Amino acid sequence: FSKKMCVELGYDSYGDVEYVPHVLRYYIANPETTVTNESADSILKELKENNTAPPEAWKVIEKGASLIGSVKYSMKKRQADGRDNPEFLDCSSFTAWSFHKSGITSVPYASNTGTFISSNKFEDISGDKLQPGDIGLKSKTGGTGGANHVGIYCGTLKNGTVVWIHCTSSSSTSLTGNSEGAMFGAYTNFTYFRRLKKWNKG
């Protein structure tokens, strides 16, 4: 747009040449979510039948599930810029993407695990109070990078399996057939839990 206006008006420069992409990263262009991975879609349906949560929480989980089978894990190559179809994310940018793309724009795309620990948009909860949409971290004090991990609680399946959606470099607890990247998993190493304040029922 800026280049076009330069030509039309005869200017050498015209504002921010990256203005349009800078604005569009905050625009949620596709509110409808499609989960293409069959295992993920089946698990998501069972989770919704077996658990209660605010509609906004399910939107977060659905957004994350839409990346299962397409997003690979990488801290170095993570594309934490809000693009619609990222190829690489790490645990925190995946969690942030899921929240932000579902409409909760107070969670920045470039979040790291430290962001989720310190954010005043979330508050601490105990593990026995978990509801779908809550987040879990390995540690309250762990640093960023490989020292910590974050994911989104999704509820339990009918057989009692506790399900998290997260993005990881490797996992032996995947429920969606992939051992790397975005997945539903029976992950058990989260010890610190937080909830978006507006979802807290008190």
Regions found by a protein language model. Name each.
Residues 6, 11, 15-29, 35-41, ...:
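Aromatic- and glycine-rich peptidoglycan recognition patches
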Residues 133-134:
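Structural motif
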Residues 3, 24-105, 141, 146, ...:
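N-terminal capping segments
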Residues 129-130:
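Short, well-ordered loop/turn sites that connect or cap secondary structure elements
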Residues 97-117, 155:
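Short, basic/aromatic beta-hairpin or loop at an interaction surface
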Residues 76-82, 112-119:
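Short linear capping/connector segments at secondary-structure termini
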